[in-house]
C-alpha cells in the first residue's frame, strides 16, 4: 500500500462527506479505508442512479468517440428525470502523432463506407457528427496542445494525410504538419457544428506523457501529463474566429475555450470581449481546488463580465465526484460574489443575476437546452 503514502500529505481529503471516514488516507489506513468504502458502496443509495438523482442531475454530457454507436445513451435515457447526451470527440482521427491514428482512420472509414482519403475521412466524420446530432448531441470537444485554427488549403491537408497514411511518416506533436492538419480539421468541425447548432469546446494546454519513462512502461493517463508553459493562442485561433465567430456568423454558434492553466485565461477573457459568442471556460486542472476557483472568478470579474463566463465542466470519471465538484463550485461562486457585493463592488441584484447565470442560465443558453424535457 506504499502508493498511498503521498496522499497523507494532501489537503481536501473529503472522504467523510460520503463515507463518514475521518482518518487521512495513508499507508496505515489504506486497508481500513478500502474496506469501509466498499461496504458503503454496496448500499442501495450508493448505486449510480441513486447518486445522480440525489445530487439533482438533470442533464449529463458524456464524451464519446465518433465511432461509438451510443446504444448505452438510449438505455440510460429510460432513467426518469435524467437525460444523457453524447459529445462528439474526434481527437483520435486528427492526432497524426498517435500510433493508433492509421487504424482509427481505417475503422471510421470502414464503418461509414468511405474511401481512406482525406475527403473520405472528413465525410466519415461528418456522417458520424450527424448521427450524434440526431441523438441529441449539443457540442463537440477537442483536446489540443494549442487551439489550432489556421487557414489551411485542402491541397496542403491532403499532402500531409498522404505522408502520414500512405508513406507512414511520423510527425512529432509540435511539428508544423500537426498544427496545419488539425487546423484544417478544426475548420471542418466548426462547419459541422454551425450546421447543426452545436457548441465547439476546446481544451488546450495539456502536455501529454511528459514523463517518457512512465509512458513507455505503463502507457497513458498514469500521472505523466503536465501543463504546457508555451501556448500560441491568438495567432493560431484568429483565422477560425474570423470565419465562424464574427460578423454575420457571430450569432450562429458558440465556442468555449478551456485553458489548462490560468496563465492563459486572461487571453481567453480578452477574446470573450472581442467575440460575442466566444466564452472563457474554467481552467480545468488549475481550478480543481476552491482557492483557485475563487482566484479565477475574481480575475474574470476584473477583466471581463463575470456573468457571461462559460462556467466549469466536471470532467469527472467517477460518479461520486459529479455532485461534489459542482457543489464546491456553487459555494465558491456565492462566497466570491458575496464578497464583491458586501464590499460595494457589485449591487445585490447584480450579484444575484451573476450567480444564477454562472450556476445555471449560461449553460442552458449556450448549449441550447431550453427544449430538454429534463429541465422543464
Q: Language model features by range: what are they?
A:
Residues 142, 203, 239:
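Histidine-centered active-site/metal-ligand motif
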Residues 209-283:
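Active-site-proximal binding-pocket segments
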Residues 1-196, 248-253, 257-262, 269-376:
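Metal-cofactor-binding active-site regions of metalloenzymes
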